Amino acid sequence: VILISNNNKVNTSDKEDIHDNLEDLSKNRDDYYEDDKKNTSFLRSLAGLVTFSTIIPLGIYTSIEAVISVIWLWPLLNALIGLGGVVIAYILLKLFNMSHLLVATIVISYIFLIMGYNHIDGLLDFSDGIMVHGDSKKKINVMRDSMVGTAGISTMVIFTVMTVAVLTNLIDYNCLWGILVGEMSAKVSLLTTCILSKPAEDGIGKYFVEDMPITNYITAVLISGIIAYIFLGYVGLFGLIGAIIAGALISYIAKRNFGVATGDVLGTSNEIGRLLSLIFIVIAIPLF
């Protein structure tokens, strides 16, 4: 990562070095997604999805086509991550008798960490982009800028407080399985945005929007619906609906502001999808 202070002048040779380094970084990033058809078995594709999505050190890289071929399992992968959150919450509550607020904070910290903070970064950039006055090109440039503005920081604070609050409410209801359903539904929100959006001309996000088969989306929703119903019944399905609404909403906002869905848009959809899913679960618990 290269950081340039606004207060320091950069001479020509430094600019050339920076340009060369950025080209190397871009090349390395593209190499990750090179269309290498060798060894793209189902298990390797699945391992590639895990490597792409988390900080779990599998170290297995494959083509973007291979990752997309198993994208219907993305919510299931998130469900396993959510299961880890359920286990953590249960241990902290039963063995250490921690307060619900502290447990909720630890659980969301675990989720952010294991996901590598990737989607959080998208939420920050997305917030900065939509708050800028100007055309879609200007908004996209701001969204892709390495600096974080007031809108991004403010959104992050509000989002984190709301997430911790709703998780605390969930624990108050003794509904720990809601952690699993909410995390799984986050990816359904992301996939919903993929289906409803137009791809950008470049960036990682364009592959998911451009090459996302509708059959994969339907399969992902059906699997998620079954899992949600098994663990929480109609409450779980209500949470899944909340995530789908979130995905559609983020797609609409992205179209209005950027015209396309970038990786930052998809990351935002993941985070807002989790939050809205959890809120819908909390609303549904007294109803069902």
What annotation goes with each model-predicted range?
Residues 2-116, 132-138, 145-146, 152-288:
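Hydrophobic alpha-helical transmembrane segments
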